Structures are given as C-alpha cells and as structure tokens.
A protein has these predicted regions:
Chain A
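Hydrophobic alpha-helical connector segments
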Residues: 64, 75-108, 155, 159
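Amphipathic alpha-helical interaction segments
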Residues: 18, 89-97, 157-164, 184, ...
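Short secondary-structure transition hinges
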Residues: 96-153, 157
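C-terminal peripheral helix-coil segments that are non-catalytic and often amphipathic
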Residues: 2-3, 130-134, 138-146, 176-220
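Basic, helix-initiating cap at the start of DNA-binding domains
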Residues: 1-30, 34-46, 59-63, 72
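Key DNA-contact positions within bacterial/archaeal DNA-binding proteins
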Residues: 49
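A short His-aromatic
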Residues: 52-55, 59
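Phosphate/oxyanion-binding loops and surfaces in catalytic or ligand/nucleic-acid-binding neighborhoods
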Residues: 72, 97-101, 105, 165-172, ...
Length: 220, 220
C-alpha cells in the first residue's frame, strides 16, 4: 500500500514535470496569449481532464513555468558560484550561466519571455526579479569586503540596476538578433557596469572578467 | 475639384491617425495577441471594411503604432534637446522625456510594449532601438568633444549598452510597480552609467544631472 502510494505520487510528480516542459515549449513559441490549455495537453500527450487535475488555469501553468525556470537558474547560479574564486568572478559566471541557459533551456527561455510579456500581467512573476536583485546585491557586498568593488556604492542600488540592465540586454538581443549576439551584448554591458563600480586595483582586470561571459567549449 | 481632393485626403489622414490611436489603446491594454481588428474598428467607430482600407493586417497596424510612437518620442527628444545646454544634460532630458511620455502618452506606452512583446515577433520594430542607439552614440561623441565623457569610450558601444539598459529599467518597473517607480529606476541607472563614463571634472555633477530625471511640475 505505502509503496503503491509512493509510486502513484512519483508518477504524479513526473506528469507535472512533463506538463511544465510541454507548457514551456508552447509559451516559448507562442507567448502567453497564444498558448491554450488544449495545445499544452496535446503536446504533453494528456487529456484535458488530466491536465486540469494538475493545473487549474493557464496563469497557474505560466506561474509554474516561471517558478521552474527560476529553480533551474538558481541551481545553475549555485554551480556557477563554484567556478568563480572571487565575488566578481562569481557575478560574471552567473551572467554567463544565465545567458547559456537562455539559449539552451526551453524552460528558461519561456520563463524569461513570460516574465517580460505584457499579456502575462496576471501571472506570478515578480519573485525572479527581486530574488536576483538580492543575489546581485549580496555579491556586491562581498565584492566590497574583498576590495574588488568601491565601498562608496550601496549594494542594494547596484542590485536594482544590474538586474533590469541584464533583462534589457536580453530583450534587445532577442528583438534585434534572435539572441545570436547575447554574449556580446552582455560583455559590453559588464564592461560599462564594472567600470562604474570596481576599485582602482581591479580596473585592469575588467577585460579578463568580462571575457568569462562566452559560450563554454561544451556548447554548440 | 482640387479642393475636394485635398479635403478627402485630409479626412483620410485624420482617419488614419484615429485608427492608430484606437489601436494603441487596444495594444496597450491587451497586448499584441489579445488585440483584434474587430476591437480596433469598434473603438475607432469604423466598419471593418473602412479599417482594412487603411491597414491590411494587425501586424501592419502594430508597425504603424510603433512608427508613430517613435515619431512622438523623437519629437519630444528634439524638444528635450533644447532644454539641455550640454550633451550630458540633453541625454538626461531625453531620458526624462521618454519616461514622461511612457507614463502619459498611450501611443508611446503601447509602442514600447509592442517593442518588447514576444508575440509581436513578426512586427517591424527594430528601428526604434537602432535609432536610439545612434542618438545616444552621437550625444556621447559630443560629450567626449565637450570633455564631459572620458575619450577612452567608444560612443557606439555606449549607445548599444544604454538603450537596452533603459529598456530593461522600464520593463522591470512595469512588472514590479506598474511604472510607479520608473523615474527612481532611471535615476539609479544613470547614477551607475554616468559613474562609468564621465570625466573626473564631471564626477561631482552626477547628482545634479540625474536629478533632471523627475516628473515635471506640469505633470500630475
């Protein structure tokens, strides 16, 4: 009995994950308004009844895609953190990781698109922005402690500036070049942002730091 | 005869403008996918046939809203240019003007929303970004000449960074605060961007410059 119960629960978890993947594909291709519950059910190979058992509305589903995207991004962020040996390196690796994921992971691409989609105004989507602002602010705080970032800066202010600037770089890269120049745009953005915030001893390091924002050798 | 002809043409121009206004209202409220030609015709008080006489598709209409928004923004930009007495002041006044328009002019709000709407991928919308990058780059070039901006910077690079950063600030302000904090976000953004690019003699002027980005006394 207990094992049956667990198996059923595991199956439900797997179905839920498959639905989120299918929904991500639809949202990524057709935007929020262009996606229907019918299309998601069909893509996931489920009846509409089975879909509604897991998600009661499209807004609910979009919220789950954004939450999943944020979870995937956070995991990658933690992995990125282990690549960097200083706060600024970690910040660069996180930028690299987010860009890489945006290009390669449909759930990330879909989550980011939903997060900037006017039509998705009713969807829960504020947390990713405010969470990343906190992450960036914390790294800036560490950067100040490590003597990499000028202590005159308020870490919270830098967090509030960096996250929207990053968001805009990916939006404009999407509109102008289908994200083909995303790494270039991010390296240019960080070249300017770092020039504003680093201490004099870190200034010569800016080209080395921004060069970390590039496709990994393992990427196509 | 000639006079009749002109009258008919003037009427056509007025109808076209009324359609663009109606479309802007619909796009602003419902996004690209959520807007129908029927709703635009109804809002403009026209038959669908009359609407199609002027615009052959929704993408055509969205392109016209973006073009009109860009025209309005450029006009305001030129007016803003006359308020500033130095290149950096002009850059700040332009930022103020764009923010003010985004809040007060439906066609601008709608145009910007269409310009960042994933669902509007088929719509002509690259020009506003590339045009503003050129405008910003030209002001940076003038700022270098005037000794306000460090000559080590490539004006084109700064243009490519500033415009997406500005775009992202408005997107995030829209998502997090319905644009209520747009001026605050822009002042913070420029505090960082100016710190990166100004010459040492202009550094003490940064607070005065960013303070120009605020609601005008004539605004509500």
């Amino acid at each position: 009995m207990a094992q049956d119960g667990r198996t059923r629960q595991q199956r439900a978890v797997a179905t839920r994950a498959a639905i989120i993947d299918a929904a991500a594909g639809e949202f990524d291709e057709h935007g929020y308004l262009g996606t229907s519950m019918d299309a998601v059910a069909e893509r996931a190979g489920l009846t509409k009844g089975a879909l509604y058992f897991h998600f009661t509305s499209k807004a609910d589903l979009a919220g789950a895609v954004i939450a999943r995207q944020h979870e995937v991004s956070r995991q990658y962020g933690e992995a990125a953190a282990t690549r960097g040996t200083t706060p600024l390196e970690v910040l660069m690796w996180m930028s690299q990781g987010l860009a890489s994921q945006m290009i390669h992971e449909v759930v990330v691409s879909a989550g980011i698109r939903l997060s900037t989609d006017t039509a998705a105004a009713g969807v829960a989507r504020r947390n990713p922005y405010t969470d990343w602002m906190q992450v960036a602010a914390e790294l800036v705080r560490q950067g100040i402690e490590a003597g990499e970032i000028d202590s005159a800066w308020d870490p919270q202010l830098i967090g509030r500036v960096v996250v929207p600037a990053y968001t805009g770089a990916q939006t404009v890269s999407d509109v102008l070049a289908d994200r083909a120049d995303l790494y270039d745009r991010l390296r240019e953005l960080w070249t300017v942002l770092l020039a504003a915030i680093v201490t004099d001893r870190m200034r010569p390091e800016i080209p080395r730091l921004v060069a970390l924002i590039a496709p990994l050798a393992t990427e196509d």
